[in-house]
């Protein structure tokens, strides 16, 4: 790995962490500050994630939607930088589909559930592109069966199958 690839790798890693941090901060602050009409706090059993970003319903909707939007754009930059230093052509479809899934997630954060048709369109395309991305990564893992790292390959294979069940 030369110095250019090392710099791109470091930059991609930092943008990826920044994006994950943005998603996490938005989710934590919005869920801690959430109160519904009955005075109840946030619960995954009673409230959807989209309701955290609904203006007029959630006091910290701006934080949640901003974290979702800017975190997704930061993760898009991570995928673009990873695409430049990718050494295996089997990973190109996975990264490209991940970019499309993250752009759909950014659209979901840009248009809250108050703009219902655009919000649901973003959510729908996110699930489609994320499932296709995971499926293409599964193809990459299956064609890499000769890799020495058997444990990480099997763990990634199990996680891919689990996420296909969830997204599919």
Task: Set out the residue ranges of the language-model regions.
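Membrane-interface helix-boundary motifs at transmembrane edges
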Residues: 6-7, 80-93, 142-152
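N-terminal signal-anchor transmembrane alpha helix
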Residues: 7-37
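Interfacial segments of alpha-helical transmembrane regions
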Residues: 12-19, 90-99, 151-156
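Hydrophobic cores of alpha-helical transmembrane segments in multi-pass inner/ER membrane proteins
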Residues: 20, 67-77, 128-137
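C-terminal TM-helix exit segments that contain a strictly Trp-centered aromatic cap at the helix terminus
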Residues: 25-35, 107-112, 162-168
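Interfacial helix-start motif at the membrane-water boundary
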Residues: 50-73
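Membrane-proximal helix-loop-helix units in multi-pass membrane proteins
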Residues: 98-144
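Terminal transmembrane helical module of multi-pass membrane proteins
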Residues: 138-168
């Amino acid at each position: 790995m030369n110095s250019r690839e090392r710099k791109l790798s470091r930059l991609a890693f930092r943008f990826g962490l920044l994006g994950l941090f943005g998603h996490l901060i938005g989710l934590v602050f919005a869920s801690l500050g959430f109160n519904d009409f009955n005075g109840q706090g946030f619960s995954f059993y009673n409230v959807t994630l989209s309701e955290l970003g609904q203006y007029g319903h959630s006091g910290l909707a701006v934080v949640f939607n901003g974290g979702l939007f800017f975190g997704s754009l930061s993760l898009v930059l991570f995928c673009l930088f990873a695409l430049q230093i990718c050494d295996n052509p089997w990973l190109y479809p996975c990264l490209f589909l991940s970019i499309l899934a993250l752009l759909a997630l950014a659209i979901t954060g840009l248009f809250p559930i108050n703009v219902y048709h655009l919000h649901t369109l973003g959510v729908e395309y996110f699930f489609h592109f994320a499932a296709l991305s995971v499926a293409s990564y599964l193809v990459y893992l299956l064609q890499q069966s000769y890799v020495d790292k058997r444990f990480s390959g099997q763990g990634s294979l199990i996680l891919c199958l689990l996420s296909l069940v969830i997204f599919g």
